[in-house]
Amino acid sequence: MFNTLKILDLPENERPRERLIKYGSQALSNSELIAIILGTGGRNENVLSLSSRILKQCEGLNGLLTLTPEEIMTLKGIGSAKAAKIIAVGELAKRFKAYKSGDVYIIKSPGDVAGLVMEEMKYFKEEHLRVIMLNTKNIVISCKDVSIGSLNSAIVHPREVFCEALKKNSASIVICHNHPSGDPTPSSEDINVTKRLKQCGIILGINLLDHLIIGHSNYISLKEKNIL
C-alpha cells in the first residue's frame, strides 16, 4: 500500500509552514514555498522532495510556472489538484506584476507598455493580440486580448480591435502581440495589419499610438522603428 506523505510527517523544524511563520517568507527556498502550496507529497515521497524534484525537472521556477496544466500533470506526483494550485499561483504572480488593482498606469513610452504586458505575454505559446485602451491622459482604462493565433489581415478584423475601445470611450489604443519564437522582428504581415488598423483608427477617431511585438527577452516598437 502506498502512502501520501504530508508536511506534518516532517520534523517540526523542517516544516515549511512553521519556518515561514517563525522566520518569514523570505527565509524559505523556492522548493519550500512550492511545498506549502502543494500541501502533500506523492507516493512514498514527502512534499519537500517532490517540490525540489519538479523544480529541477522544470529548470527552476520560471519553467514550472509557464507550463500548461496538461504539461504539469505529466510530472510524477502531480495530479489535477496540485496542477491547479501551481497554475493559480503563477497567474496571480503575473497579474500582480503586470497591473496592480487600483493603480493608475500611465503610458509615456514603449517601455511603459512593455512593463505592463511583457512579463505575461513573452511566455505565450500562441500569438495573442492584446489591445490596451487609454484615456485622453494616456492612463490605461482596460486591456483585452482580441485574437489568438497567427496575426494576419484575414484573422485580425478592425471590428474586434476597436469594438471594446469604443465601448470604453478610449481616446487612443496601443496594440501588442507576441512572437512565440522569441524573435520580435516584425513580419510583413505584422506591418500590413498595423497600417490597416492605423487607418481604421483615424476614421473612428481613436489613435493607434504604437504596436509592440514581444519576444522572449526583448521587444520591438513599430513606432520607434518609424513603421507606424
Swiss-Prot record:
Kindly give the InterPro entries that the UniProt entry links to this protein: MPN, RadC_JAB, RuvA_2-like, UPF0758, UPF0758_CS, UPF0758_N
Q: Where is this motif: JAMM motif?
A: 177-190
- Coiled-coil positions: none
Q: Any idea which UniProt keywords this protein has?
A: Hydrolase, Metal-binding, Metalloprotease, Protease, Zinc
> Which positions are annotated as binding Zn(2+)?
177, 179, 190
UniProt signal peptide: none
Q: List, alphabetically, the Pfam families matched.
A: RadC, UPF0758_N
Molecular functions (GO terms): metal ion binding; metallopeptidase activity
Keyword Metal-binding annotated = yes
Q: What are the MPN domain coordinates in residue numbering? A: 106-228
- Write out the GO biological process terms: proteolysis
Q: Which family does it belong to?
A: Belongs to the UPF0758 family.
What's the protein name? Answer: UPF0758 protein NT01CX_1687
Q: Which organism is it from?
A: Clostridium novyi (strain NT)
